[in-house]
């Protein structure tokens, strides 16, 4: 009898342990060694940034709510940080990887990132935010799959491929940084790469991907480049757009897609053509001279080379604007949760604040700078979030140095200083990006997705709201603004933290075209924001200061 009771007790404890194990989301551990290495993206050997010896870096394959733990060892000769472009880090900007939220990983040291793609699915990527490292590599794909119990609005593909497209410079990241520090532009890129390579286009390239005839494939396309919008297309194949930066979209077929810097598209491609080789084509947009590269797709068992006749890309930005207007949120599909995306009626929420952000460029002390509303951001030695957390904000930066509706005089006179907006928690805000320049801009917001309700030519006025898409605009994290145009986005600032609003044009970001949105919880509650992790790095004015004891407490 005693043995039976003991067995029953053991079974009970085992069952309890099983419950505990399954109650917590899975953990996935990675160790990354960041080093310099040599590669030939454009056919000429040059220094690049490798992760575990790879260029591009490893793909992160995760599922909604997974705990992703990455121990990053910096073996470069410079400070280093990675950001996870599009991951929202709910209540946890401590892992965002921007200079305003984290101290850099110093040479010869390491830091362990721990983040969750909480209630997210979709196609993303990571890249370095320090200096001009992005121009040397250090980037890679990041996919977040739906949980098994959540229905997906398309059949399971045969395989899942990540296509990282971007412009490329033959000059090193240190040379490019010297140009910018000296007040010069880095100019136009030398080429385009697909997954770190530029195809010869003569049929001699090794295939990047292999397809089985008749099968469908998930193809995720991200523009990880420095500054250039890129059009992507596949010979003789249509791409069915199914997802965009974490949102399921209405499924339309496209011959080509304009992918602006920082953006990601999830497509379905069917191998329904004659079994042979086909070219993927990536070409620059909005440059006087078009730069093109190719990557090879090979049908399994296929015979015959790819045709040398490449499909032509579109011309002008009006075509691109029309394509943007064709993107629609799939209101009936479920994203990371069982409820349909369309159950959130953003168009019925009252706007509580309108912020207009006007991008400009000019010279300060004879050197090129880029600005928002007349302020060109500079990173203080003490990260903004640390200054805020340790209660020394007044020693590091001032809030709201720009106005929500800048005058022409304010825009014209550029000042260099930290640019931090104070945003009230849980307010529904309209942000208008106004582009008076001749180049296409690409804007990203960390910590959130927003509804891109309009992109139109001209100057924004309140009357333009009548043209907003208040029903099925796509919820995303990066939006383009065409020359002499404006873009409007809507969102609820419900994720506490210090969040970067930046130009995805690396040259512009480095020279000041960015700001931070500070969203603080009035209750200082753990329900709204996590305390600074014990493992967080400290630098600047708080380098040797003890961490505050649980400033965020309560439910």
UniProtKB/Swiss-Prot annotation:
Which of UniProt's keywords are assigned here?
Answer: Disulfide bond, Germination, Glycoprotein, Metal-binding, Oxidoreductase, Repeat, Secreted, Signal
Q: Sorted alphabetically, which Gene3D superfamilies does this protein's record hold? A: Cupredoxins - blue copper proteins
Q: Where is the signal peptide?
A: 1-23
One GO MF term, please? Answer: oxidoreductase activity
Chain ranges of the Plastocyanin-like domain? 25-145, 158-301, 345-524
Where it sits in the cell: the answer is: Secreted
Asked whether the UniProt record includes Disulfide bond among its keywords, one would answer: yes
EC number in record? 1.10.3.-
Cystine pairs: 103-539
In what tissue types does this protein appear? Maximal expression in early binucleate microspores; declines considerably in mature trinucleate pollen.
Glycosylated residues in this chain: 33, 61, 110, 330, 350, 422
User: Which InterPro entries does this one have?
Assistant: Cu-oxidase-like_N, Cu-oxidase_2nd, Cu-oxidase_C, Cu-oxidase_fam, Cupredoxin, CuRO_2_AO-like, CuRO_3_AO-like
For whether the record's keyword set contains Metal-binding, the answer is: yes
Organism's domain of life?
A: Eukaryota
Q: Which PANTHER family match?
A: (RAPE) HYPOTHETICAL PROTEIN, MULTI-COPPER OXIDASE
The task this protein performs is described as: Probable oxidase that may be involved in pollen tube growth.
Q: What is this protein called?
A: L-ascorbate oxidase homolog
Native organism = Brassica napus (Rape)
């Amino acid at each position: 009898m005693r043995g039976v009771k003991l067995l029953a007790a053991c079974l009970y404890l085992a069952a309890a342990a099983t419950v505990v194990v399954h109650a917590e989301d899975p953990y996935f551990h990675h160790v990354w060694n960041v080093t310099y290495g040599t590669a030939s993206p454009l056919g000429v050997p040059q220094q690049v940034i490798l992760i575990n010896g790879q260029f591009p870096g490893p793909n992160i394959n995760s599922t909604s709510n997974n705990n992703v733990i990455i121990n990053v060892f910096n073996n470069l000769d410079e400070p280093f940080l990675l950001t996870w472009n599009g991951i929202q880090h709910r209540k946890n900007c401590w892992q965002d990887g921007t200079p305003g939220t984290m101290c850099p990983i110093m040479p010869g040291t390491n830091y362990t990132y721990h983040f969750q793609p909480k209630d997210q699915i979709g196609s993303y990527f990571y890249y370095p935010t320090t200096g001009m490292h992005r121009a040397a590599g250090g980037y890679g794909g990041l996919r977040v799959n739906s949980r098994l119990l959540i229905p997906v609005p398309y059949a399971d593909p045969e395989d899942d491929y990540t296509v990282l497209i971007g412009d490329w410079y033959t000059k090193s990241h240190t040379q490019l940084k010297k140009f910018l520090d000296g007040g010069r532009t880095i100019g136009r890129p030398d080429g385009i790469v697909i997954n770190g390579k530029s195809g010869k286009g003569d049929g001699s390239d090794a295939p990047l991907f292999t397809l089985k005839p008749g099968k469908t494939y998930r193809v995720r396309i991200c523009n990880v480049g420095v500054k250039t919008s890129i059009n992507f297309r596949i010979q003789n194949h249509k791409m069915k757009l199914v997802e965009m930066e974490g949102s399921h979209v209405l499924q339309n077929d496209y011959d080509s897609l304009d992918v602006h810097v920082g953006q990601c598209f999830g497509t379905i491609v069917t191998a329904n053509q004659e079994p042979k080789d086909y070219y993927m084509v990536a070409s620059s947009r909005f440059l006087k001279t078009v730069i093109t590269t190719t990557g090879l797709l090979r049908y399994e068992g296929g015979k015959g080379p790819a045709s040398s006749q490449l499909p032509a890309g579109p011309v002008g930005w009006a075509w691109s604007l029309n394509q943007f207007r064709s993107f629609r949120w799939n209101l009936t599909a479920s994203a990371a949760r069982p409820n349909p995306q369309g159950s959130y009626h953003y168009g019925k929420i009252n706007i509580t604040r309108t912020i207009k952000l006007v991008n400009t460029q000019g010279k300060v002390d004879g050197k090129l700078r880029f600005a928002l509303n007349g302020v060109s951001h500079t990173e203080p030695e003490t990260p903004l979030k640390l200054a805020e957390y340790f209660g020394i904000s007044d020693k590091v930066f001032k809030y709201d140095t720009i106005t929500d509706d800048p005058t022409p005089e304010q825009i014209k006179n550029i000042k260099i200083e930290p640019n931090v907006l104070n945003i009230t928690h849980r307010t529904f805000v309209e942000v208008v990006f106004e582009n008076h320049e001749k180049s296409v801009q690409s804007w990203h917001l960390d910590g959130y997705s927003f509804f891109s309700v309009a992109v139109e030519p001209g100057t924004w006025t309140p009357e333009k709201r009548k043209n907003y898409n208040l029903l099925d605009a796509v919820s995303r994290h990066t939006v383009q603004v065409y020359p002499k145009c404006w873009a409007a986005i809507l969102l609820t600032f419900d994720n506490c933290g210090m969040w970067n609003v930046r130009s995805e044009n690396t040259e512009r970001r480095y020279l000041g075209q960015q700001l931070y949105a500070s969203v603080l919880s009035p209750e200082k509650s753990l329900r709204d924001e996590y305390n600074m992790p014990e493992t967080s790095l400290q630098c600047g004015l708080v380098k040797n200061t003890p961490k505050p004891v649980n400033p965020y407490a309560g439910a």
